[in-house]
Structure formats: structure tokens, C-alpha cells
Amino acid sequence: MPRDVDLFVLNQVIEHVPHPDRLLTMLANALSPGGHIVIETPNTGGLDARLFARRYWGGYHIPRHMVLFNERNLRTLVERSGMRVVETAHLASPAFWIQSLHHAASESRMAPLASLCTFRNVPLVALFAAFDIVRGRLTTTSNQRLVARLAT
């Protein structure tokens, strides 16, 4: 296989793949020297992931999300595929907050409030976007970006 690809972008993709290790190894083998892979994926280490982990976290997207990552296991997976992590970032994820609240409210005495927890509720989306932007500067969020470079 020629090593002639400079960049692969996996934007909310890797969690849908049954064998992400095989995918990353295949992509690493196609990268040109100095080539990069950018991965954005849910992060199970975010606050909402931990608060709603037992059942309601919006990032689960069962059955579509086959594999979920925290920062550590994503980094390990990338490094085992022959790449070096050069950058990580925490991204805002208001959608996961809204989905989590909607799921939790739907199955509780607060069910009437579930109808407020939608993406059409612009103030709620703005609130959680701002919350995650601040959190992302201080700690983790439930959405992450990792940039890796082919190790030479």
C-alpha cells in the first residue's frame, strides 16, 4: 500500500467501528512521512458522562457507538498503531448534556420537563455550550480531539 496520504480526519467516526485498533493501524500504514490523523470522539471522562454514566449519558448512542474512549485509552490505542500524539483538546458538547437530561427526565417524575430538553431549546443549548467551553479550558469535557503524527 502506498504511503501517500497526508491527513485522515475521523470526526465522530472511530466510536462506530468494531475494531478501531485495526482501522488506526491501516490508516497509519497509508500515511506519508509526517502525515497526521485527527480524531474527534466522545470522552467518557467528561462530567456529564460521569454524572449520567449508569444509564442516561447522551454519548452512549446505543447501539451505534460500539467503542467509547477516555483520553488515556484513546492515546494508548493511537500510540500502539505507530503514531505519536501531538495535540489534544476538550470540545464543547451541549448535545450530550441535553440528551442526558432528556433521557433522565423522561424516566422520572420530571417527565414533563423532558420536552424542554431538546436541541430546539436555544437558551439551553447556549447554556451548556458556554458551560463546556469554560470546562474545556479547565478540565475535561465529553467530547475530545486528538491529533497524531506518524512516528518516525
Model-derived segments and their meaning:
Residues 87-152:
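A C-terminal cap/extension of S-adenosyl-L-methionine-dependent methyltransferases
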Residues 83:
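Short phosphate-binding/catalytic loops that engage adenosine nucleotides
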Residues 54-58, 138-139:
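Short, flexible turn/loop "capping" segments at secondary-structure junctions
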Residues 38-40, 58, 116-121:
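N-terminal start-of-chain detector that recognizes signal peptides
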Residues 57-72:
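Acceptor-substrate binding/catalytic loop of class I
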Residues 1-52, 68-80, 144-152:
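Conserved SAM-binding loop
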